[in-house]
Curated annotation (Swiss-Prot):
Name assigned to this protein: Ribonuclease HIII
Record GO biological process: DNA replication, removal of RNA primer; mismatch repair
Domain RNase H type-2 per the UniProt entry, residue ranges: 91-308
PANTHER family reported for this sequence: RIBONUCLEASE, RIBONUCLEASE H2 SUBUNIT A
Keyword vocabulary terms for this entry: Cytoplasm, Endonuclease, Hydrolase, Magnesium, Metal-binding, Nuclease
Protein source organism: Listeria monocytogenes serotype 4b (strain F2365)
Cofactor: Mn(2+); Mg(2+)
EC number: 3.1.26.4
Keyword Magnesium: yes
Length: 308
């Protein structure tokens, strides 16, 4: 079970020490100021103001101190090998997220968005939250309301460019890292001289891997950057970025459908194979590759359907 570590200020550390007093463990490891054990989780606070949570309930327990969002029935966010400051959910943060990576049709779309504490009540009122359960019409409605309010940058990797990069040996993780880094850099430029308190990336790769992907970039954003899975639940900036990214993805998807004259399906299942085969039959393989991620297995499946 991976550890979850958070960084807190001194008053919070003292508060945690008092809160966990009924569960205290008298045996302290080196550098610790308190240790406690609750069902499913061991908590250790250190002089460095780092607090480590270990056990099956570690992430859930840590989230009580990291964010003020209510617990959901889904798996708790994972702060993978990273440290989120205390009260992170109320800080001024640039968040970034992407969509379209698992869809055969359509571009990879990345958005970075800045949300400060003053804007949070309005964004919540406008419906900004974890968007995974939202339908496209709701996404579009909310995105159109928040885009004028939230400094953001959206970058798309069109399918022809995606296929070109993929043939040159670049994997999807590398493409996403480049897009995230550049989108975040764009928002930082828009904000200057204002600086965010942190940057949170919805994690798709380990931190070291992410920065290895960026090794040849002339400008790499490293300062105050954090990575977490399910980051939409950790800060509204990521939730806003996800909504805007999906809105732009839907727009691109609709434009492609009109251009090819066929409603294009999302995902990469058998229903996608059938539409891909129809496009090959009507317009040829070259047209299909213009709208798709060519290396997906759907290409070969569609070709087999055409040959039958």
């Amino acid at each position: 079970m991976a550890n979850t570590v958070i960084l807190v200020d001194q008053p919070t550390l003292e508060k945690m020490k008092q809160t966990y007093l009924p569960f205290s463990n008298p045996k302290l490891p080196p550098g610790a100021v308190f240790a406690a054990k609750k069902p499913g989780v061991s908590i250790t606070g250190y002089k460095s103001r780092k607090v480590m949570f270990q056990g099956v309930n570690g992430e859930v327990e840590a989230k009580k101190w990291v964010a003020t969002l209510p617990e959901s029935k889904t798996k708790a966010p994972s702060v993978s090998k990273g440290i989120l400051p205390a009260n992170f959910a109320s800080k001024n943060v640039i968040g970034s997220d992407e969509v379209g990576t698992g869809d055969f049709f359509g571009p990879i779309t990345v958005c970075a968005a800045y949300v400060d504490a003053e804007m949070m009540p309005l964004l919540k009122e406008l419906g900004v939250k974890d968007s995974k359960a939202m339908k496209d019409p709701e996404i579009c409605r909310i995105a159109e309301k928040i885009m004028p309010l939230v400094p953001h940058s959206v970058l798309l990797c069109p399918n022809p460019k995606y296929n070109e990069l993929q043939k040159r040996g670049m994997n999807q993780g590398q493409m996403k890292a480049l897009l995230h880094n550049r989108a975040i850099e764009n928002v930082l430029k828009k904000l200057a001289p204002v600086k965010p308190e942190a940057i949170l990336i919805d994690q798709f790769a380990e931190k070291n891997t992410y920065y290895r992907y960026l090794a040849k970039e002339p400008s790499i954003i490293r300062e105050d950057v954090f990575f977490a899975t399910k980051a939409e639940g950790l800060h509204l900036s990521v939730a806003a970025a996800s909504i805007i990214a999906r809105y732009k993805f839907v727009q691109a998807f609709d434009a492609m459908s009109k251009e090819v004259g066929i409603p294009l399906p999302k995902g990469a299942g058998p229903h996608v194979d059938a539409v891909a085969a129809e496009i090959i039959e009507r317009f040829g393989l070259e047209t299909l590759t213009k709208y798709t991620k060519q290396h997906f297995a759907n290409t070969e499946k569609a070709l087999k359907m055409v040959k039958k």
